[in-house]
UniProtKB/Swiss-Prot annotation:
Stretches for region Disordered: 338-378, 457-484
Example GO molecular function: ATP binding
Entry binding sites for ATP: 569-576
Name of the coding gene: Iqca1l
Ranges of Basic and acidic residues composition bias in the record: 338-363
InterPro entries, alphabetized: ATPase_AAA_core, IQ_motif_EF-hand-BS, N-DRC_Component, P-loop_NTPase
Name the UniProt record assigns to this protein: IQ and AAA domain-containing protein 1-like
Organism annotation: Rattus norvegicus (Rat)
Regions of compositional bias (Basic residues) in chain numbering: 464-479
SUPFAM superfamilies: P-loop containing nucleoside triphosphate hydrolases (SSF52540)
Keywords: ATP-binding, Nucleotide-binding
Family: Belongs to the AAA ATPase family.
Length: 822
């Protein structure tokens, strides 16, 4: 597509953005219980609109060439992504669950389930920093050094005699198979000759033979024509893809080449822009800098004189933390500036006096909070209040910049998509002015001291820096003591790789986690039934909680803080695959703190503390990082089994929880735990540590259908070869089986030999059922046990309580209606 196409897409996106910003709820708006459904609908609509905007901005940022527009697009893209995460948090608070049934909203907005897909910004992988690339290269080098040692340990020596015996066995087996095939053919020929001798050969006349040949040939031709006509009809109505695969592949290849060429142009234009930035800054500093400096000095001197004339003394110069001389240039009179400075001094005195009264106030505030909470509990109408957004100011600023600068500016002046020199000079002029202001402030402070000595005979008074606003002591973080001050981070990184705590993740994308969405979620909700999440919902939640937050520092800062996720589900549901997908999509390090992997490493009394310190220190420096804890129930065991007491799986628990609490906004470190048996863990500790708990049930029919279809196609089988395969029957039969089971059965059936036979022997559903029957499914009792545990989590309890309240209210309403009818 051309640059004009992306420009029009950008303009259309801003038109939509303007409408969406008008629909935003006001912050701290109370949400009443009776308004819950309407508020849920509003938030759902906003969520879907912002998802669409995220998709458009992602495409525009990836393909637009002009460097200044791309900077604005990047801020908008991060702001919209942050808003999507905030709305997701609001939906969880309203729905009291991690699964949101938006099928009714999709239908009313005339959208499709594809619009529910969370787009992952492409720049997460394309614009990885040099630090991340160097770290990946360092990991590859360390693993390459370790591979020969591991292979030497694993390989067992073999004598010449043993090798000869193995070769002889293989050769004899080959000759035996060949001999058996030859004898089978001889027996077939003998059997055929025997039948001919017994029955006699049927004799045909020339005409009869011709008729038989014509019949067979005409039947063959007619079947081919009917098959071709059916194929054309199915392609015409869109039920089958076009048979011309080469045309489609050529179109995709051409589009890929076009995208890559635009990305190459982006790099070229960015280099030009960086050179222009340096030249413009230097030019403005040389040409306009001296005039700016003199003008500022004159203004400040005039302010000194006016203040002295009004008050009889020279003013206190604003310090740098307050803005310095910027306060003087903000269109204020000397009297106003003096009043502001005096007000600041009085406030500082008041704060010092109020320090002694803080304890009394805290007690009163606690009492007030208790009374408010009691009132809120007594008042069932108020559910919660809308939280203020950190992303909307960023989005508003970006939208205003687009409206004021780029909306009315066309690309006729710069068809080559080069930077706009006028806009660049305006931006750099402000920067140069700020730099010169700092220099002028230093000079004028000294001049003010000299004036006080010469005119008022005052000695220099030390300027007190304004004290920071006092916050609650509980909110302050204690600075963590560095237990490895004499070690470089690179050496610590290498040490963790060598002992196996840092591992290389497999290249798995989030789209490889196959699943379909829940189509009847709203229907189940209206029937007061709790819908189970589909595999599509799990993939979306991982994209929201894991990928978007770890991919960008700005998004992580704006989004609600989520430090840990727990994935609960039976074996074979792809929990570890999701962890690796997060690492692949964001380029994150993978730390393995599973109890089995930690066993025997950093022993001793303080070994656990040192281990957590090194892991989190390296994870923070080389962020983004994912800390995976497999079989996490062992870390939170209620009672450690006898056979696992040597492992001591709970030894890192306290230090792990302490280190996790130190993570804040901007620390792109995510802890992801996986478990199949959460019932063995202490419920309170597990739920307190993991902030988000995602339950992965057995796949439903829609997900199983997509799994069978996609997994078979991924084995190199085209759509035409699977026409005779009843995938719907396979999806029905495989109820209770996990994606891992389905993949095992497909790999068992589709061997190399079977793939070669597809042209003569099409696939049949019974082939897969035979192998599937050999595997143990997830029994209903196991899933019910996991559900019962999940409903005991804090969010699960709230959901159950809310559902029961709704059922009771519905029963009461029906009872009233019956009484009225009587």
């Amino acid at each position: 597509m051309s640059e004009g196409t992306y420009q029009r897409l950008w303009e259309a996106s801003h038109a939509t953005l303007e409408e969406v910003l008008e629909k935003e709820p006001s912050p701290l708006e109370p949400v009443l219980t009776r308004e819950r459904q309407s508020f849920q609908y509003r938030i759902s609509v906003l969520y879907l609109y912002y998802l669409g905007l995220l998709r458009r901005f992602n495409l525009a940022y990836d393909q637009m060439v002009q460097p200044q527009k791309r900077r604005l697009l990047r801020r908008l893209l991060d702001g919209v992504a942050g808003r999507v995460l905030e709305l997701k948090d609001e939906l969880v608070r309203v729905d009291l669950c991690e699964t949101h049934c938006l099928d009714r909203v999709l239908q009313e907005l005339k959208l499709t389930p594809v619009d529910l897909e969370v787009p992952i910004p492409k720049y997460f992988q394309l614009e990885q920093t040099s630090t991340m690339k160097a770290r990946q290269q360092m990991l590859a080098e360390i693993l390459a050094r370790l591979e020969p040692l591991a292979s030497q340990e694993n390989l067992r020596g073999m004598s010449r005699t043993e090798a000869l015996i193995i070769v002889q066995c293989a050769e004899r087996a080959r000759q035996g198979r060949l001999r058996a095939t030859f004898m089978r053919e001889i027996r077939k020929e003998e059997e055929r000759d025997r039948r001919i001798r017994e029955n006699g050969r049927q004799k045909f006349s020339q005409d009869q033979g011709a008729i038989v040949i014509q019949k067979v040939w005409k039947g063959y031709l007619q079947r081919k024509r009917i098959e071709q006509d059916r194929r054309m009809e199915m392609e015409f109505i869109g039920m089958l893809p076009s048979s011309s695969q080469t045309t489609r592949q050529n179109a995709l290849a051409q589009a890929f080449v076009g995208e890559e060429s635009r990305r190459t142009r982006q790099v070229e234009k960015e280099e030009e822009f960086q050179e222009a930035i340096a030249k413009t800054h230097e030019s403005l500093t040389e040409t306009e800098g001296p005039d700016m400096k003199e003008r500022m000095k004159d203004q400040i001197r005039q302010w000194f004189i006016e203040c002295h004339a009004l008050t009889g003394r020279f003013p206190d110069y604003p310090d740098e933390a307050s803005g310095g001389s910027y306060l003087i240039f903000a269109d204020k009179t000397p009297e106003q500036v003096r009043q502001e400075l005096e007000a600041q001094a009085q406030e500082n005195k008041k704060k010092e006096q109020e320090k002694n009264k803080d304890k009394v106030k805290e007690k009163k505030e606690k009492k007030k909070k208790k009374t408010k909470e009691e009132k809120a509990k007594k008042d069932p109408e108020v559910m919660f209040k809308v939280l203020p957004s950190k992303s909307i100011p960023v989005i508003n600023a970006g939208h205003e910049e687009f409206t004021s600068i780029w909306k009315s500016r066309y690309d006729n002046k710069h068809p080559s998509q080069s930077f706009d020199s006028e806009t660049l000079r305006e931006e750099k002029r402000k920067q140069v002015e700020m730099e010169i202001r700092v220099q002028v402030d230093e000079l004028m402070r000294q001049e003010l001291r000299n004036l006080r000595l010469a005119v008022d005979r005052e000695e220099t008074r030390p300027l007190k820096s304004p004290k920071k606003k006092g916050g609650k002591k509980s909110g302050k973080k204690k600075k963590e003591k560095d237990l490895t001050p004499d070690r470089s981070v690179d050496s610590l990184f290498e040490e963790l790789v060598v002992i196996g705590l840092i591992k290389k993740s497999l290249l798995v994308t989030l789209n490889d986690y196959i699943g379909d969405c829940l189509y009847l979620g709203s229907t189940l909700t209206l029937a007061n039934k709790i819908p189970m999440p589909s595999l599509f919902d799990i993939r979306q939640n991982i994209a929201l909680y894991g990928v978007l937050r770890l991919g960008s520092h700005d998004i992580h800062t704006m989004a609600p803080l989520v430090r840990s996720i727990l994935l609960v589900g039976p074996s074979g549901m792809g929990k570890k695959m999701l962890v690796q997908a997060v690492c692949t999509e964001t380029g994150a390090n993978l730390f393995d703190l599973s109890p089995g992997n930690v066993m025997g490493k950093y022993p001793g009394k303080n070994g656990s503390q040192l281990l957590m310190h090194i892991v989190f220190k390296v994870a923070r420096v080389f962020q983004p990082s994912v800390i995976w804890i497999g079989n996490t129930e062992k870390t939170f065991y209620k009672k450690i089994p006898k056979e696992e007491r040597r492992m001591d799986p709970k030894r890192i628990k306290k230090d792990l929880m302490r280190a996790t609490r130190q993570l804040g906004p901007g620390d792109r470190v995510m802890l992801i735990g996986t478990t199949e048996r959460p019932q063995l863990a202490e419920m309170k500790g597990l739920c307190r540590f993991y902030e988000r708990i995602l339950f992965i049930p057995r796949p439903d029919y829609a997900s199983r259908y997509v799994l069978w279809k996609r997994m078979i196609e991924n084995q190199g089988i085209g759509v035409q070869q699977t026409q005779s395969l009843d995938i719907s029957a396979l999806a029905r039969v495989s109820d209770g089986y996990t994606p891992g089971h389905i993949l095992q059965s497909i790999q068992s059936v589709l061997t190399e030999r079977r793939l070669l036979q597809l042209t003569k022997k099409p696939l049949v559903a019974s082939e897969f059922v035979v192998h599937l029957a050999k595997l143990d499914p997830v029994y209903r009792e196991e899933e019910e046990s996991l559900k019962e545990w999940f409903y005991k989590t804090p969010l699960g309890k709230k959901n159950i309580k809310f559902t029961k309240d709704q059922q009771e209210a519905e029963e009461a309403r029906l009872a009233k209606e019956k009484k009225k009818k009587k």
